[in-house]
Amino acid sequence: MFDRRPAAFVTYHAFLFNASYLGDKSIEIQVNPEFETVEAARVEALRFAPVIGRLPNVLLKEVETVWIHKGNNPFGGGNNNLLIHTEQADDYISDGILEETLVHEASHTSLDADHAESEGWIAAQNADPDFISTYARDNPTREDIAETFLVWLAVRHRPDRISDSLKQTIEATNPNRLAYFDEQDFDFFPILIPEKTPKLKEFNLNLNRLDFYLKWESRFASLYDVESSINLEDWSVLEGGIPSQGDITETSDELPTGFDRIFFRIKEKR
């Protein structure tokens, strides 16, 4: 385990806990024996495991272990790991930036190797007016990905948590870096739940009555929209928020008129 206090890798007989997350992700949490008892170590593991689990899958894909020590020392990323010092964590929690810090460190662990020196990223760096922070500017290869990913996440997926002026500043400062991240098709579960395509079981179209009937496989407690299009590009909702009726859901409605062809699709909302 790397420990920032001696600034070295140290062999500890650590307390080990397994954190399992949706999507078959499992992370081993290794807690320094200085916490003395398995109960005290478990408290620390349970303190951080849920927060780590709220990170998007893209940031956890290379995380295999978490190291937890006492001490007021910076967190760390890399080595297929997240490094936590608990007194520093207390400060991050007081400042309201624990999750933001873990996003930064997990970016090192899961993104740096594939992106920090890629042609696309370097081209985006060169095309943008400036770096998003002095830390990124002073460490363009080591810190720019982690610094920029955090603000990209805020702008694209949590804009309600930043001011309009800050959002505009980020977009003006790093438009090409933001576009680079946009193009990556990152797995953002659980921040974004992937759209599910229901399996159609039956479809009937009655041109005499000008109505249609749809039946599809559904999931308990989900909601569904039935949409229509005349060109497979522009879609409009025919029926919205249809509650699941169990394993199978069905609906019928009048056909839109005035078209020589029409397409339907069913979308799960939640």
Named regions from a protein language model:
Residues 1-82:
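Auxiliary, metal-adjacent structural segments of Zn-dependent hydrolase domains
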Residues 52-59, 105-106, 110-114, 153-157, ...:
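Sec/Tat-exported extracytoplasmic proteins
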Residues 96-115, 146:
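Active-site recognition of the HExxH zinc-binding catalytic motif
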Residues 123-195:
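Metalloprotease/metallohydrolase-associated module, dominated by Zn2+-dependent proteases
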Residues 194-270:
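Short, composition-biased motifs enriched in small/polar/acidic residues
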